[in-house]
Amino acid sequence: MVPEVRVLSSLLGLALLWFPLDSHARARPDMFCLFHGKRYSPGESWHPYLEPQGLMYCLRCTCSEGAHVSCYRLHCPPVHCPQPVTEPQQCCPKCVEPHTPSGLRAPPKSCQHNGTMYQHGEIFSAHELFPSRLPNQCVLCSCTEGQIYCGLTTCPEPGCPAPLPLPDSCCQACKDEASEQSDEEDSVQSLHGVRHPQDPCSSDAGRKRGPGTPAPTGLSAPLSFIPRHFRPKGAGSTTVKIVLKEKHKKACVHGGKTYSHGEVWHPAFRAFGPLPCILCTCEDGRQDCQRVTCPTEYPCRHPEKVAGKCCKICPEDKADPGHSEISSTRCPKAPGRVLVHTSVSPSPDNLRRFALEHEASDLVEIYLWKLVKGIFHLTQIKKVRKQDFQKEAQHFRLLAGPHEGHWNVFLAQTLELKVTASPDKVTKT
């Protein structure tokens, strides 16, 4: 299969060379990418269609901010089963759950955004959702069970004049870093699959992994262990929202900035600066500002007060700003696999519950999301013992058993999650 993919990648490269003028934008302000006669907006991505093969599901093209088309081959996570299967319109093979009778489980729902279909678990960019983002911010979205979750991410400075896009990311990196995307399963992976051979937290330097050992990844590592070049900067406020299927809504203007419908921000005044305990929401052109209500319970015993934040945070969620290297004495555990469950018990339409069952842990994390004014907010993270979770397992349905890093792609990049303590108040922790 690998030679076939390389041949298809070569065909795509020839196609891009054959249509060099199609890959560049015309003149501002109407900037777009033209690929095989179809227009794409900056930030939009798609599977290319090449004759005679048709849609290339293992290849993805992206229209950059400079309106240049770049295409790359999708990297599939390792599978740990003797007979993985590849379903139609999917690139990566997956394991078939042996305990589920055939035909009883519906296939994961796909997502559609701006005329492009995305498969369950696929990651893409959608910059138009946050028109007021900073130059070093980008929007990363993920398709999960037919719903699109998007996050505003603050990218590190690449430090070179011509950075390249990273697969499974909306950020860019220098050529040396981006070209180090490894095709070998034995490579040491870190955030977004970029290799860092000097990572002291890699699994037993120099030793080969066994056939059943998961590939190491830094996606689910605590923020303080993320390599300096890829650690999100705290200057940018990060929001996590779900894009609902609704008609276009009016934007809001506050302090000279434009905010799209559903976007939230902390207002700022010259005499006081940003107000972390006040949160404003754009609702179809109208600004609604509320005072933050902090959670009464935290997932740790001793939450701490941090300057610049309204509510206390757990110590393990803090990033050391002076920590420029990966710790050589404290290394995160290998994430392994994680089973993702969704609640099937009757519940209001404005609630979503997910349960994450880690292989290497005796605890199960239950995430509760609540729909508040058109946006799903993370309201609670509760940890229960596996034996206690098994007692209510009949109320959950297994979605998939992906590598933990895939599920945590947003958590690894997100410095702040919106947490609600009441249906009408929103809190940033």
UniProtKB/Swiss-Prot annotation:
User: Which GO molecular function entries does the Swiss-Prot or TrEMBL record give?
Assistant: BMP binding
Kindly list the cysteine pairs connected by disulfide bridges.
Answer: none
Native species of this protein? Answer: Homo sapiens
Phosphoserine: residues carrying this PTM: 182
Q: How does it assemble?
A: Interacts with GDF5. May interact with BMP2, BMP4, BMP5, BMP6, BMP7 and INHBA.
Q: What causes induction of this gene? A: Up-regulated in breast tumors but also in lung and colon tumors.
Question: What protein name does the entry list?
Answer: Chordin-like protein 2
The entry's keywords: Chondrogenesis, Cytoplasm, Developmental protein, Differentiation, Glycoprotein, Osteogenesis, Phosphoprotein, Repeat, Secreted, Signal
Q: What does this protein do?
A: May inhibit BMPs activity by blocking their interaction with their receptors. Has a negative regulator effect on the cartilage formation/regeneration from immature mesenchymal cells, by preventing or reducing the rate of matrix accumulation. Implicated in tumor angiogenesis. May play a role during myoblast and osteoblast differentiation, and maturation.
Q: Which domain of life is it from?
A: Eukaryota
Q: Provide the tissue specificity.
A: Highly expressed in uterus. Moderately expressed in heart, liver, prostate, testis and ovary. Weakly expressed in skeletal muscle, kidney, spleen, small intestine and colon. Expressed in the secretory epithelial cells of uterine endometrium, fallopian tubes, endocervical glands, bladder and prostate, as well as the transitional epithelium of the urinary bladder, and in bone osteoblasts (at protein level). In normal cartilage, expression was confined in a few chondrocytes in the superficial zone as well as in the middle zone.
VWFC domain span:
31-96, 109-175, 250-315
Its encoding gene is what?
A: CHRDL2
Q: Look up the record and give one Gene Ontology term from the biological process aspect.
A: cell differentiation
